[in-house]
Amino acid sequence: MARASSTKARKQRHDPLLKDLDAAQGTLKKINKKKLAQNDAANHDAANEEDGYIDSKASRKILQLAKEQQDEIEGEELAESERNKQFEARFTTMSYDDEDEDEDEDEEAFGEDISDFEPEGDYKEEEEIVEIDEEDAAMFEQYFKKSDDFNSLSGSYNLADKIMASIREKESQVEDMQDDEPLANEQNTSRGNISSGLKSGEGVALPEKVIKAYTTVGSILKTWTHGKLPKLFKVIPSLRNWQDVIYVTNPEEWSPHVVYEATKLFVSNLTAKESQKFINLILLERFRDNIETSEDHSLNYHIYRAVKKSLYKPSAFFKGFLFPLVETGCNVREATIAGSVLAKVSVPALHSSAALSYLLRLPFSPPTTVFIKILLDKKYALPYQTVDDCVYYFMRFRILDDGSNGEDATRVLPVIWHKAFLTFAQRYKNDITQDQRDFLLETVRQRGHKDIGPEIRRELLAGASREFVDPQEANDDLMIDVN
């Protein structure tokens, strides 16, 4: 259904566009086309005048004037060129005549001179002496020097000669440095040495900047407890002369925290042989000094952890720490602390057996027996050679009629020895022969402890003997009869 129309007219919002244009610009009118064309022509002429265009009459006058001026200039140039030609012609004829006369006179004079000198000898040309500047001569000798490097055959100074000259110069510098080394070592002896194994009078030869930098690092390490280590300290293991550099940092005054971090750093980055040097020169000395200087003769916790970390390389620990500690005469306190570290850390069986064989051959001492007991208590499957060494070690303390075993027969044996003997009987009673068992029972009877001796005897009797196998018989078992 359509919408109903409204009678009310809507009010417009604004006037129509046509009314707005009329109000702003006036009434719109039609423009005549002729007037529009005239206006365009006028505008075009005005634009031409502004751009500098001229009409045809003016341009013809300008071209005529330019042509007249050009003709006048060409006429003047032509007249001048003709005058020059006439002058040159007169000059050349005069000069040719004069030159002919001069040549005749010179020939006559030269002939007279030759006739005058003919009786006396040949004619010699006089040499001209030229003075050379000193700077030019020095520069010439620098590039073309006459010496051993100068190739006299070819008369040149080539690249090979320069290379040989530089090689000889380098060799001379090396010889000079070798001559100066004794003097440098004498100057460095005043810096002292650490008790880490440097011989008396031995010093380090390092650049002054390096010594200054690592002296500053050493002053930082005195009070270092946590955080990151200086980068200069971390790069020491990668240096070839790390022992000289670490000596400058004064390891005796490192804090215990630094000893632990340094042990981890050096043992993990150096080879076993180089790690042995670090453990022996620094860690062992700090271990002994700390126990000796402490009031209760205990070891600092961080140094204890450092000793534990040094077992990361067992061969370096045994050769650089344990063996020197025993050989230099450690006390039972030091052996007990070091042994507790050894008891807590797993050691490869081969390293353990080799260390045990080495300790069994040393003269008797209670600290050595402490380490023997700890290694036996690890329950490793020892080689028969090491087991035999253990048997001979305990057998040598029995009393012999001829007294061939010396002081070992009369020595008062400590309790730790009996404990080590009991440990061996418990762990390896099935790895000994019957003859060895009899000798050990005799030792227990003569030198046995009142409480520990019966236990050792019971363990030895409970074990089974190791059967001795002849190598030839073992090979016979593997033979096959092919007939």
UniProtKB/Swiss-Prot annotation:
Q: Does the keyword Oxidoreductase apply?
A: no
Q: Name one Pfam family in it.
A: Bystin
Could you tell me which residues carry Phosphoserine? Answer: S172, S190, S404
* Acidic residues: compositionally biased ranges: 96-123, 174-183
One GO CC term of this entry?
nucleus
UniProt record, GO biological process? endonucleolytic cleavage in ITS1 to separate SSU-rRNA from 5.8S rRNA and LSU-rRNA from tricistronic rRNA transcript (SSU-rRNA, 5.8S rRNA, LSU-rRNA); maturation of SSU-rRNA; poly(A)+ mRNA export from nucleus; rRNA processing
Primary localisation category: cytoplasm
Q: Which domain of life is it from?
A: Eukaryota
Q: Where is this region: Disordered?
A: 1-21, 33-55, 67-123, 171-200
Subcellular location, in the record's words? Cytoplasm; Nucleus, Nucleolus
Q: Which UniProt keywords apply?
A: Cytoplasm, Nucleus, Phosphoprotein, Ribosome biogenesis
Task: Provide the GO MF annotations for this entry.
Answer: snoRNA binding
Is the keyword Phosphoprotein in the record? yes
The annotated regions of Polar residues compositional bias extend over 185-198
Which family does the similarity line name? Belongs to the bystin family.
> What miscellaneous comment appears in this entry?
Present with 21600 molecules/cell in log phase SD medium.
Its job:
Required for normal export of the pre-40S particles from the nucleus to the cytoplasm. Its subcellular location and association with pre-40S subunit shifts from mixed cytoplasm/nucleus to all nuclear in RPS19 disruptions, suggesting it acts after the ribosomal protein.
Q: What is the name of the protein in this document?
A: Essential nuclear protein 1
> What organism is the protein native to?
Saccharomyces cerevisiae (strain ATCC 204508 / S288c) (Baker's yeast)
Q: What is the lineage of its organism?
A: Eukaryota, Fungi, Dikarya, Ascomycota, Saccharomycotina
